[in-house]
């Protein structure tokens, strides 16, 4: 007989899983889906194992997922309850959370775990911690973790720069933790088990709101103050153990590298006219005055075809005079002043292509010379403090703490910390206005900064610049040595289905993001290839099977030569019993009969060992959020060669381009799709609820969709029967349009626009053509060809 089998799900004892995922519901909704044998998931959890014992004669098979020391996840099938208990006892000495976590971690590698599992008679194979947008501090600037490469030097918790030795990536489905830290606009977003460099704090001893800290004034007036802060220590704390009021420890780079002069030779050599060359000096001194001019350019400056300009308000007389003075002194240039009287704006325009090229190269981070691409050269992050203060003063005078450049925002915050204060930025996302019936899309957020004092020494200098300081002398955080101590003000959780990343860093085993300090921690089936060059490097021998995961099908997996002689399993990895989750991927397996958990293990084992997997059913990989290489901001799709050409920076909006799973598979492949003779067909599925939703134009959780789904199930017993076997004419009696959608699906005429850059693929009735990025041909580019 042929059984529909889903071997990989999770119970309520795993993070990010529905609290209703108990054995009774798993069996009930598995039957409605059309599953004949279902993996229990999480069978190593002691409370869940006791629950499973009550259902040992039902259509279940004992399964669990375990994460090893390399953060590779393994799907494990076990023969009996006694063998689960035996495995638990062996793994207790390698695991701290096997008694409390449904998906435990162990301190051994895949090879050791394989031997242990096989010793108890089980089967094992690879299954499917920071999200990809996380921005890190590098020696040469900032970079998103998705773009980090081996050899890059990142800032560590020891306040030094160390090389990245490995980059890990895995698909993660479950809860992620979002930690909001005072002074930082970006939350720290990470998996619950990821260690964070922090301090566990205690409450104030006088009973008032707040934490005990070394800069608390009460200690000087309250004789009974216990000064509990003296016991504080910096340590690595698991993210899920942090609480509001605990303090994040953030290293402040203290390196100083002065720059005396900048050469303009390469820009001058492009100018043919001697007169133009003679006006501009061949090198300029990087003085405090030049740094203040840089600040003005970052706030008010721009490049145009024939030079640079500054756009100011007519009430900014002091700034206008200062810019004119600085440009004359440094570059020997006078402006053409544009003041047409029709607005309150004044433009200072300096006609010099030398300066256009110089400022364009130095103070932008992309091809487009626009406000949202402005940035400081990385070398300027280590200038002496007196020069960095002038950059800040020029920028603040011009824009009063506002920027649309995320990179510049992070650079200025880092500079402010070096100076003894911090610019706290708040993010303002523009609404999309309309012109008539047409919506105008705005991609660029605005960052509004305000100054918070952390070091008394800087106060007078800021006051002299009329910079608005907080009215009350309330200092929630503090700087001590070369570290900022910033309290956590909010912690939340959110369901996440996508890729997460992690780094292995030499010596210090840590890295600093723009909002926190994280430890090495980590894994999808692609993640194994991030941790190892080969599946055999992980296990030292062949595993029993490979789980495809939601982002791959057999065509993609068989592009990798070493996988071609291994059985493939397609499972749902469901975290809830909803029919569009449970059984969304499953296997058709030939078995002699369906019994209890012990009999079912023997049947599945025999099928895996003797090529009795009849078919794999799963989602079309195009539906995945990261199938194609695409921009994470505007979701423009890129061909791999174009993404590399633009250095993984979107030329359209300045966002980060993320490498797609398909691109990664192609890198690992030998260029062929070769299926072995025993490989069963892979059938692409779309859950019934999603097809109903597409047909009637209602959300998947709406009453209308749910009612129709129940009608189909009431007549046919389960969803798989509806999708694969039911007669279309009979389906039409329930709902003709949904029946037509199912018919189109069976004929392969439901189309998908592939996902990418964090955007899910979209199903459609119409054929979809991928809109790849195409470089706009401007007159300037055409002339350069």
Curated annotation (Swiss-Prot):
Q: Cross-referenced SUPFAM superfamilies, in alphabetical order?
A: Hedgehog/intein (Hint) domain, PHP domain-like
Q: Is Transmembrane helix one of the keywords UniProt gives this record?
A: no
Domain DOD-type homing endonuclease, which positions?
293-421
Disulphide bridges: none
PTM annotation: This protein undergoes a protein self splicing that involves a post-translational excision of the intervening region (intein) followed by peptide ligation.
Q: What CDD domains does the database record attribute to this sequence?
A: Hint, PfuEndoQ-like
| UniProt cross-references to InterPro entries, sorted A to Z | CHP00375 (IPR005287), Hint_dom_C (IPR003586), Hint_dom_N (IPR003587), Hint_dom_sf (IPR036844), Homing_endonucl (IPR027434), INTEIN (IPR006142), Intein_C (IPR030934), Intein_endonuc_central (IPR004042)
Lineage: superkingdom? Archaea
According to its UniProt entry, the protein's GO biological process terms are: intein-mediated protein splicing
A molecular function annotated in GO for this UniProt entry is: endonuclease activity
Q: What are the record keywords, sorted?
A: Autocatalytic cleavage, Protein splicing
NCBIfam families, per database record: intein_Cterm, intein_Nterm, TIGR00375 family protein
Recorded hits in PANTHER family, A to Z, give:
PHOSPHOHYDROLASE, PHP FAMILY, PHOSPHOTRANSFERASE
State the protein's name.
Uncharacterized protein MJ0043
What organism is the protein native to?
Methanocaldococcus jannaschii (strain ATCC 43067 / DSM 2661 / JAL-1 / JCM 10045 / NBRC 100440) (Methanococcus jannaschii)
């Amino acid at each position: 007989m042929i059984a529909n089998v889903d071997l990989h799900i999770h119970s309520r004892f795993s993070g990010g899983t529905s609290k209703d995922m108990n054995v009774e519901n798993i069996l009930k909704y598995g039957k409605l889906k059309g599953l004949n044998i279902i993996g229990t998931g999480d069978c190593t959890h002691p409370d869940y194992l006791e629950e499973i014992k009550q259902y040992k004669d039902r259509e279940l098979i004992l399964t669990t997922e375990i994460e090893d020391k390399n953060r590779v996840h393994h799907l494990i099938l076990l023969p009996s309850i006694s063998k689960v208990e035996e495995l638990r006892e062996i793994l207790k000495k390698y695991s701290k959370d096997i008694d409390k976590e449904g998906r435990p971690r162990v301190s051994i590698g895949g090879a050791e775990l394989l031997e242990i599992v096989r010793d108890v008679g089980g089967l094992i194979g690879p299954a499917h911690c920071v999200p990809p947008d996380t921005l890190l501090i590098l020696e040469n600037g900032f970079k998103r973790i998705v773009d980090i490469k081996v050899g890059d030097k990142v800032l560590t918790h020891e306040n030094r720069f160390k090389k990245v030795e490995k980059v890990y990536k895995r698909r993660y489905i479950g809860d992620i933790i979002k930690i909001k830290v005072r002074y930082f606009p970006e939350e720290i977003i990470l998996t619950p088990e990821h260690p964070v460099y922090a301090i566990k704090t205690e409450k104030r001893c006088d009973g008032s709101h707040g934490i005990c800290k070394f800069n608390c004034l009460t200690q000087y007036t309250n004789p009974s103050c216990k000064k509990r802060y003296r016991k504080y220590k910096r340590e690595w704390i698991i993210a899920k153990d942090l609480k509001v009021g605990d303090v994040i420890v953030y290293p402040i780079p203290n390196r100083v590298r002065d720059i005396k002069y900048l050469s303009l030779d390469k820009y001058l050599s492009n100018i043919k006219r001697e007169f133009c060359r003679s006006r501009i000096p061949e090198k300029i001194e990087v003085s405090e005055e030049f740094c203040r001019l840089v600040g003005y350019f970052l706030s008010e400056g721009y490049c145009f075809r024939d030079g640079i300009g500054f756009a100011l308000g007519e009430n900014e007389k002091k700034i206008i005079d200062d810019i004119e003075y600085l440009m004359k002194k440094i570059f020997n240039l006078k402006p053409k002043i544009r003041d047409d009287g029709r607005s309150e704006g004044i433009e200072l325009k300096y006609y010099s292509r030398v300066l256009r090229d110089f400022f364009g190269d130095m103070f932008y981070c992309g091809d487009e010379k626009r406000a949202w691409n402005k940035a400081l050269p990385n070398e300027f992050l280590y200038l002496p403090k007196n020069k960095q203060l002038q950059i800040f003063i020029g920028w603040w005078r011009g824009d009063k703490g506002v920027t649309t450049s995320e990179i510049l925002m992070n650079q200025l915050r880092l500079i402010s910390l070096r100076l003894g204060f911090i610019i706290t930025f708040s993010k303002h996302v523009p609404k999309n206005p309309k012109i008539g019936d047409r919506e105008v899309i705005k991609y660029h957020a605005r960052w509004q900064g305000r100054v918070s004092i952390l070091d008394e020494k800087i106060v007078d200098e800021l006051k002299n610049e009329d910079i608005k300081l907080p009215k009350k002398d309330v200092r929630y955080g503090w700087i001590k040595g070369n570290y900022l101590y910033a309290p956590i003000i909010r912690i939340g959780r959110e369901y996440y289905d996508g890729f997460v990343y992690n780094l292995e860093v030499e010596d210090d085993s840590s890295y600093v993001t723009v909002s926190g300090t994280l430890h090495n921690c980590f894994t999808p089936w692609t993640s194994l290839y991030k941790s190892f060059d080969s599946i055999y490097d992980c296990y030292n021998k062949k595993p029993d099977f490979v789980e495809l995961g939601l982002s791959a099908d057999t065509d993609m997996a068989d592009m990798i030569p070493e996988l071609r002689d291994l059985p493939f399993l397609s499972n749902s990895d469901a975290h809830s019993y909803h029919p569009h989750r449970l059984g969304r991927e499953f296997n058709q397996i030939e078995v002699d009969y369906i019994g209890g958990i012990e009999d079912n293990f023997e049947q599945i084992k025999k099928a895996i060992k003797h090529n009795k997997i009849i078919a794999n059913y799963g989602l079309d990989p195009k539906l995945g959020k990261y199938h194609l290489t695409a921009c994470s901001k505007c979701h423009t799709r890129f061909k791999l060669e174009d993404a590399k050409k633009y250095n993984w920076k979107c030329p359209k909006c300045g966002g980060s381009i993320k490498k797609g799973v398909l691109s990664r598979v192609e890198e690992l492949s030998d260029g062929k799709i070769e299926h072995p003779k025993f490989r069963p067909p892979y059938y692409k599925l779309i859950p019934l609820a999603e097809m109903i939703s597409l047909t009637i134009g209602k959300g998947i959780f709406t009453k209308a969709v749910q009612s129709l789904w129940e009608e189909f199930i009431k007549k046919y017993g389960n969803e798989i029967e509806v999708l694969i076997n039911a007669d279309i004419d009979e389906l039409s009696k329930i709902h003709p349009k949904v029946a037509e959608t199912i018919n189109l699906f069976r004929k392969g005429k439901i189309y998908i626009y592939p996902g990418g850059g964090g955007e899910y693929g979209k199903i459609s009735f119409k054929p979809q053509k991928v809109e790849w990025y195409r470089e706009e041909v401007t007159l300037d580019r055409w002339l350069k060809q």
